[in-house]
């Protein structure tokens, strides 16, 4: 895992998660964590409102939150994912909806497991090329599945107003089951083309399960929502 001072080239940082998780750290402990990185506590505790925080402040906040997660949570790899999991993997990406108002999907394969990371596209950062955006309407799209999954993460669900069409309430008819969500993520991953990019990430687990492929073989699916995604040399 990393920390402030470790060189990373971030492409995605969830300010919504940073805000929520910072608020859950007791003040005395937050002060000690900030001191470990020689960070001004006032910058760490700055409230994110309409504008995104300066990049330096964002990364300082991320360093503190990541350290707290490392120490307090069971952070696993991809083999036996716990509540938080991390990895380095070659992923493809796609935005469903507008480039700044859509939902973002990173997806790849790891030892026969489909890995899918879902988040809001407005958390994309950096100067790299943005993933391809597909203008898909709500009906008949992946959006009901994505929104249903993101309901399991308080920060992303509270942040859903940033995403187009998210103000439409999900009805029971719209809301897919876990098995339907797993299958739709598999189908979506198969439709994303283009080269894989090597990334490293830390994500919160949303759903883990297995579906049978057309030949009857089990396909394991791990779906999460990332705190951050950064470039790495891994491309498999």
Which sequence ranges carry the predicted segments?
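Long, helix-rich, hydrophobic modules that act as membrane-proximal anchors or helical bundle/coiled-coil regulators
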Residues: 93-236
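Membrane pore-forming effector domains from diverse proteins
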Residues: 1-29, 50-111
């Amino acid at each position: 895992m990393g920390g402030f001072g470790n060189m990373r080239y971030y492409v995605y940082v969830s300010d919504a998660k940073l805000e929520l998780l910072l608020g859950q750290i007791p003040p005395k402990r937050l002060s000690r964590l900030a001191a470990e990185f020689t960070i001004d506590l006032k910058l760490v505790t700055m409230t994110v409102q309409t504008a995104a925080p300066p990049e330096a402040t964002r990364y300082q906040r991320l360093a503190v939150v990541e350290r707290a997660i490392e120490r307090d949570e069971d952070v696993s790899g991809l083999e036996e994912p716990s509540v938080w999991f991390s990895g380095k993997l070659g992923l493809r990406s796609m935005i469903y909806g507008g480039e700044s108002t859509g939902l973002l999907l990173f997806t790849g394969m790891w030892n026969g497991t489909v890995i899918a990371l879902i988040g809001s596209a407005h958390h994309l950062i950096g100067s790299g090329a943005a993933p391809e955006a597909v203008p898909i309407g709500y009906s008949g799209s992946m959006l009901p599945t994505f929104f249903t999954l993101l309901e399991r993460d308080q920060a992303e669900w509270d942040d859903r107003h940033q995403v187009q069409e998210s103000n439409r309430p999900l009805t029971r008819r719209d809301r897919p089951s876990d098995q339907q969500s797993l299958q739709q993520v598999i189908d979506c991953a198969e439709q994303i083309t283009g080269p894989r990019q090597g990334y490293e990430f830390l994500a919160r687990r949303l759903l883990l399960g297995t579906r049978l492929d057309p030949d009857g073989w089990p396909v394991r699916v791990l779906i999460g929502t990332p705190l951050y995604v950064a470039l790495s040399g891994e491309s498999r």
